[in-house]
């Protein structure tokens, strides 16, 4: 691993992990090159959404099963192991202490999350600790008004190469494969006693049945 190779941070509830998450992680790794490290960070106690249905231990176990055989992707337990409320700025502060001040950190978020960024705790500190990579969705256009518009004009990257030339401070955009899979849809199917196969790895589906998560029956 090169000293200043980027670390790409993909957070989420992963409740459960599915092929949409995995494809996103793989495409991010391929985009930034073989030296890039992609970390999937399952959330702990998120303040901006309802608590996950499965425990942190179960979600970690499903992630481990899903990532078997893919060494370019790894799990970071920083938020799951934290007690109390979990905020992105605290996660980035911990990661900065771990990797130092020179290595690029690239925090990935969707368009909805980016538009709500000014509501996040100590949001202006986030860009001091990491870059932000926004995953475009089809038909999305950004309204460049208000404080977020000013923020983007100040920090917008000319190209995504800017995100690997310095440790933090830039906002980039990327278009990835849209798979139309959601964890809530997987849970809905399970609750209806319908199979979610081909939406998530078979190993994860077996684990869900084994532990009767989301109302699954171990058949």
Swiss-Prot record:
InterPro entries named in the record: Cyt_trans-like, NadD/NMNAT, Rossmann-like_a/b/a_fold
Reactions that this protein is recorded to catalyse: nicotinate beta-D-ribonucleotide + ATP + H(+) = deamido-NAD(+) + diphosphate
Keyword Nucleotide-binding: yes
UniProt feature coiled coil, ranges: none
Classification via SUPFAM superfamilies: Nucleotidylyl transferase
Species annotation: Hahella chejuensis (strain KCTC 2396)
Keyword Acetylation among UniProt keywords: no
Purpose: Catalyzes the reversible adenylation of nicotinate mononucleotide (NaMN) to nicotinic acid adenine dinucleotide (NaAD).
Any matching Pfam family: CTP_transf_like
GO terms for biological process, alphabetical: NAD biosynthetic process
Pathway(s) it belongs to: Cofactor biosynthesis; NAD(+) biosynthesis; deamido-NAD(+) from nicotinate D-ribonucleotide: step 1/1
EC code: 2.7.7.18
This protein's UniProt keywords: ATP-binding, NAD, Nucleotide-binding, Nucleotidyltransferase, Pyridine nucleotide biosynthesis, Transferase
UniProt name for this protein: Probable nicotinate-nucleotide adenylyltransferase
Superkingdom, natural source: Bacteria
Family assignment from sequence similarity: Belongs to the NadD family.
GO molecular function, one term: ATP binding
């Amino acid at each position: 691993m090169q000293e200043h190779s980027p670390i790409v941070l993909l957070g989420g509830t992963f409740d459960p992990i599915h092929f949409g998450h995995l494809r996103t992680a793989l495409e991010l790794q391929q985009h930034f090159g073989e030296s890039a490290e992609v970390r999937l960070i399952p959330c702990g106690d998120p303040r901006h959404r309802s608590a996950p249905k499965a425990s942190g231990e179960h979600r970690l176990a499903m992630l481990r099963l899903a990532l078997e055989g893919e060494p370019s992707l790894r799990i970071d337990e920083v938020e799951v192991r934290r007690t109390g409320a979990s905020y992105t700025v605290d996660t980035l502060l911990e990661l900065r202490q771990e990797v130092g001040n020179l290595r690029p950190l690239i925090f990935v978020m969707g368009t909805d999350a980016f538009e709500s960024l000014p509501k996040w705790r100590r949001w202006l500190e986030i860009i001091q600790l990491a870059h932000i990579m926004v995953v475009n969705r089809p038909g999305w256009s950004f309204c460049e008004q208000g404080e977020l518009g000013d923020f983007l004009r100040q920090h917008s990257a000319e190209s995504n190469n800017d995100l690997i030339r310095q440790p933090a401070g830039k906002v980039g955009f990327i278009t990835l494969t849209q798979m139309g899979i959601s964890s809530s849809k997987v849970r809905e199917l399970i609750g209806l006693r319908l199979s979610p196969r081909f939406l998530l790895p078979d190993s994860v589906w077996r684990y869900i049945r084994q532990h009767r998560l989301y109302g699954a029956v171990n058949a």
